[in-house]
């Protein structure tokens, strides 16, 4: 059985850890509140913008967009969103798992034909360990999502796609649903996927009774870059909110575990102390009777 001093030292150590996890939970919770507000304000706009574009591209209009062209996939770009720091449960591990699965599906293309755009320090480090060369560093976008930085990344991807330097772009990120639920998604970014248009229940029907000026072609040409830039920005906001939610939950669990451990150690301390007092009394009684 451990001595009183050892048990007391361990109690103090766990109490110190509990203070840290509790403080981290409060910080993460405050950041989550801010990030949640940002994503909840942005998602309706992004979805509506995307629906308007989908309606135009699926309508019987004599317009074709180069961003919708399907071609054999010879070169692919993968944009994966993670966090810059750890202590957020399985958040980063799940991103890495899906990333490895995605890379495995394109392995036959060769490593040189798989371009990785890591958004976040953790996925960037993992990409380097796997032997890939990251196409830039986007740690700032993961920590503090900025529309300008997201738009710059979107512009780069669009240019590469138009120049046929890449044939497909995929996104891997967490979609924030609630503090307890963050859904990991893998979506095709380019070419634009119009398959959702085939499902009436999901899209609620195509509305194409728009008055278009100056022309549908010009409107679509202006709208697509905005939609694609907005998609990257929304994914960054989604991932950021999911990260803070995962960290808040992880720190809450850690704090609860610390409380339980402190209770167990306190019981052990009291039991050990009581045993020591009993032994001392027995020694005193035994000595007086000798």
Swiss-Prot record:
GO CC annotation terms, alphabetical: plasma membrane; proton-transporting ATP synthase complex
Primary localization class, coarse: membrane
Name of this chain's protein: ATP synthase gamma chain
Record-linked PANTHER family: ATP SYNTHASE GAMMA CHAIN (PTHR11693), ATP SYNTHASE SUBUNIT GAMMA, MITOCHONDRIAL (PTHR11693:SF22)
UniProt subunit comment: F-type ATPases have 2 components, CF(1) - the catalytic core - and CF(0) - the membrane proton channel. CF(1) has five subunits: alpha(3), beta(3), gamma(1), delta(1), epsilon(1). CF(0) has three main subunits: a, b and c.
Topology relative to the membrane: Peripheral membrane protein
Keywords carried by this UniProt record: ATP synthesis, Cell inner membrane, Cell membrane, CF(1), Hydrogen ion transport, Ion transport, Membrane, Transport
One GO molecular-function entry: proton-transporting ATP synthase activity, rotational mechanism
Annotated SUPFAM superfamilies: ATP synthase (F1-ATPase), gamma subunit
Family label: Belongs to the ATPase gamma chain family.
Entry's localization field: Cell inner membrane
Gene Ontology biological-process annotations: proton motive force-driven plasma membrane ATP synthesis
Native source organism of the sequence: Bacteroides fragilis (strain YCH46)
Domain of life: Bacteria
Function: Produces ATP from ADP in the presence of a proton gradient across the membrane. The gamma chain is believed to be important in regulating ATPase activity and the flow of protons through the CF(0) complex.
């Amino acid at each position: 059985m451990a001595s009183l001093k050892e048990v007391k030292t361990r109690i103090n150590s766990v109490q110190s850890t509990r203070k840290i996890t509790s403080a981290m939970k409060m910080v993460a919770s405050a950041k989550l509140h801010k990030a949640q507000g940002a994503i909840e304000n942005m998602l309706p706009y992004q979805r509506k913008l995307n629906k308007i574009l989908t309606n135009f591209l699926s309508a019987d209009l004599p317009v074709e967009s180069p961003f919708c062209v399907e071609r054999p996939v010879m070169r692919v770009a993968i944009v994966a969103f993670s966090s810059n720091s750890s202590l957020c449960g399985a958040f980063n591990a799940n991103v890495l798992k899906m990333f490895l699965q995605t890379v495995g599906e394109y392995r036959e293309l060769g490593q040189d034909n798989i371009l990785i755009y890591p958004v976040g320090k953790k996925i960037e480090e993992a990409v380097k360990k796997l032997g890939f060369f990251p196409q830039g560093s986007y740690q700032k976008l993961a920590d503090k999502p900025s529309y300008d930085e997201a738009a710059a990344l979107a512009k780069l991807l669009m240019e590469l796609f138009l120049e046929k330097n890449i044939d497909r772009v995929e996104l891997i990120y967490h979609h924030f649903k609630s503090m307890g639920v963050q859904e990991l998604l893998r979506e095709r970014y380019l070419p634009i996927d119009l398959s959702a248009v085939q499902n009436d229940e999901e899209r609620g029907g195509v509305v194409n009774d728009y008055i278009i000026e100056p022309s549908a072609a010009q409107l679509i040409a202006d709208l697509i870059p905005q939609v694609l830039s907005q998609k990257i920005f929304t994914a960054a906001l989604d991932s950021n909110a999911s990260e803070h939610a995962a960290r808040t939950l992880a720190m809450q669990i850690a704090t609860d575990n610390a409380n339980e451990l402190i209770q167990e150690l306190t019981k052990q301390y009291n039991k050990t102390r009581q045993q020591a007092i009993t032994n001392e009394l027995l020694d005193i009684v035994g000595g007086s009777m000798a």
